[in-house]
Amino acid sequence: MRRCAALLLVYALTIPSNFFGADDAPLSGYSPRSSQSERDWEAKFRAIPDPANLREYMKRMSARPHHVGSPYDKDNAEWILARFKEWGLEAHIETFNVLFPTPKVRLLEMIEPTKYTAKLEEPAIAADPTSNQKSEQLPTYNAYSPDGDVTAPLVFVNYGLPEDYEKLDRLGISVKGAIVIAKYYHSWRGVKPKVAAEHGAVGCLIYSEPQDDGYTRDEVFPQGPMRNPNGVQRGSVMDFASNSPGDPLTPGVGATADAKRLSVKEAKSISKIPVLPISYGDAQPLLAALKGPMAPNEWRGSLPIPYHVGPGPAKVHLKLEFNWDLKPVNDVIAKIPGSVEPDEWIIRGNHHDAWVNGAEDPVSGQAPLLEEARGLGTLLKQGWKPRRTIIYAAWDGEEPMLLGSTEWVETHAEELKQHAAVYINTDGNDRGLLSMGGSHSLEHFINGVARDIEDPETKMSAWQREHLSDIAQASADDRKELRERPDIRINALGSGTDFTGFLDHLGIATLDLGYGGEDEQGIYHSIYDDFYWYTHFSDYDFVYGRALSQTVGTTVMRLADAEVLPFQFTNQADTVHKYIGELQKLLKDKQEEVRERNQQLQEGVFKATFDPRRPTVAPAREEIPPHLDFAPLENAADALSRSAERYQKALGTKQAGLDQQGVETLHALNAKLIESERKLTNEDGLPRRTWYKHLLYAPGVYSGYGVKTVPGVREGIEQKNYAEANQEIVRVAKALEAESTLIDSAAQMLEQTSHP
């Protein structure tokens, strides 16, 4: 959505001036003396990133297709390695061998009631010079679909989510033995074949609906930024949320040369039914051939056809075969050793692989990472020395499902548990507002960074612009909180990019940052995501790339140099209380929904509204969900609030003398702070998916990338497993109690330190 800067400025008059920070206030975790020195170094750093360099980095890295195992993927890794070394960082390439299937046979044809053979191809466009590199481009496909040869009636299932199948049940339609066709979006793509298989389907097609990223939203490429009739979204359909991301053959351990591997048949995360992505140009003849009930109004897209559900009379034949080969992924790892606490690590990452040329995804994020590294290298030559060790990582294999970062995390898990303080992630970057997500112990900290970054278009701070934009779009209740709460609430993280192993598996405090939201785009995972598209329809002057370098570079420096890691737990406690309220409302809403539906069944409402020309099946009567005992969770959250306030008070009284505390004292205190996020994990993991250890954040089993907060409890309620939800309440409460105890011990340590 485009925003009006004039409207935002009107709202600025309503915000207290102290919301925008003050340069003379000491930074969190710094004494006044070290704070001023830090601000001076940060100002020098923010003057370094250059849009001209970002443009050249993107042009170079996106010049050819660079998917996993391709020659240019390796070439880019070696080029990045050379740049890190040129700028004074210690650097090496770490290689893992992972399963990465590529297609041998792709056939989709309609055999009844008429004949149609899908093109399954994105043609080159004359205006777009890299779109013609066909011999190097991966075909349009979904990685980790199994081989398959199926012929079956077609059924349209909207977005292919569980609630869509509930609607099909009401229509009396089964997908058992059918091939389903689903729209992209509203969930991670791998959820669609997962749910289809659970309902008995034998195959799955996923198409890009023009209502979502095509001509309904703007002109199509090359006249505009949106997906044209032949554009296809490649992507992984690995069932990572129910199992784990990374190499399917080495779950839980690094995919090193000598790792013990499963067979492909033993790999649990490979999709259960064949899956193929198609364009809306190929989807239209298939959808037009469907009959049966008209699709519900909210299912209908913008193709010039009546949207029927089926089944049939359209019958399709889908045949897929893949090369099931191991391919190398090349992670580029660079290091700046810490001068005081080298065994505490600040890790910064972005991936470098793409499905094709990948200018937007991922190079628009990778280029700013490189410019950050160049900037820090420049500061090193001027005498700056980070207190902690900084690690820069250019991950490979993110697109197939976080292969490079996950294998690195699993290989180095014990080291990371001991040393990793914070992980900071970026991915694709565009023009617009700053998006902040991550661990809520870092919420106050990252708000402070955002206050110090200038938005390139409005010249107000990135924080102020985001804050005013939130007010412009908020409800009356939300506007009240936005105006009263000092910090913007940051997003909780699920998955979908390289922070997953750090946060969800190891419990390392994490941030995920990026700009965007102002420009439409419809080239995601297609051959048209390239330098031509980006420099015509996105951040073509690279000023938001520079802003990302400035934002994340400042974040890295501020974390690396602080005497005390700038964790703040009052915002985290507030967020936990908010999650508990959401869970209680979720349960209450479900109870009321079931109670009302049961009453309508008893009253005969469904019988009275039955239309024999449009027959539907009445829902089944259900037991009303039981009450859950949230008291342990509420008590634990209250304890966390008290501990957080105690720690904040203790830190405030000792902040002036932090630079005079001994290294051993500060190291012991920081070790507790690093451990705080780990306390929110459980070694047994989440129910039925033990790789995911974090009890507050996880990707949803039926949402994929989308986060489920307090996932064991929330998904227990959503999936009607109420006994399990009660058990998870107790587990989460114990984790919060353990974190509270740790925070109390950190507060006590501060209280007992001598005054400067």
Which residues fall in each region the model found?
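Second-shell loop/turn segments in exported
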Residues: 40-48, 62-71, 140-145, 179-186, ...
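Bacterial N-terminal signal peptides
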Residues: 7-16
